[in-house]
UniProtKB/Swiss-Prot annotation:
Its EC number is 4.2.1.10. NCBIfam families: aroQ, PRK05395.1-1, PRK05395.1-2, PRK05395.1-3, PRK05395.1-4. HAMAP family: AroQ. The record marks R18 as: Transition state stabilizer. Gene3D superfamilies: Dehydroquinase, class II. Transmembrane segments: none annotated. Catalyzes a trans-dehydration via an enolate intermediate. It is an enzyme of class 4 (lyase). This is 3-dehydroquinate dehydratase. It comes from the Bacteria.
Length: 146
């Protein structure tokens, strides 16, 4: 079985409440339940972590070292600001896919830059919660090939 860690950054605990026209109407718990069903079908153990605190996200990444085969991360607004989160991902050297529910390039200019996309195995944005499912399938495909 492959071990995949899904990390969600700041404000994603408010999915379904915060700007649902941008981020969708499903809450994070429902999304995780759906993803865990998909993970079972792919023979993946999926663990999830969400925090609004940058240092907790960093600790989660550090703790994934040698315990996780792949990371799927939605850094949320930290995408555009967090060099330290980028450095944490580089330090553990675990392949990851960056996911965003909205298309960050169709939004405000300050959201167009990502500190993660150039070091990510893949980048998915603009497909809502389906982006997470696609990332999970791509993580599985990557892990079975490599």
């Amino acid at each position: 079985m492959f071990r995949v860690l899904l990390i969600n950054g700041p404000n994603l605990n408010l999915l379904g409440i915060r700007e649902p026209e941008v981020y969708g109407y499903k809450n994070l718990s429902d999304i995780i339940i759906s993803l865990k069903k998909t993970a079972v079908s792919l023979n993946i153990i999926l663990n999830h972590f969400q925090s609004n605190a940058e240092h907790e996200l960093i600790n989660c990444i550090h703790n994934s070292y040698k315990n996780v085969d792949f990371i799927i991360i939605n850094p949320a607004a930290l995408t555009h600001t967090s060099i330290v989160l980028r450095d944490a991902l580089l330090a553990v050297n675990i392949n990851f896919i960056e996911v965003h529910l909205s298309n960050i390039y169709k939004r405000e200019k300050f959201r167009h830059h990502s500190y993660f996309s150039d070091i990510a195995t893949g980048f998915i944005c603009g497909f809502g919660i389906e982006g997470y499912h696609f990332a999970l399938h791509m993580a599985y495909k990557y892990l079975t090939i490599n």
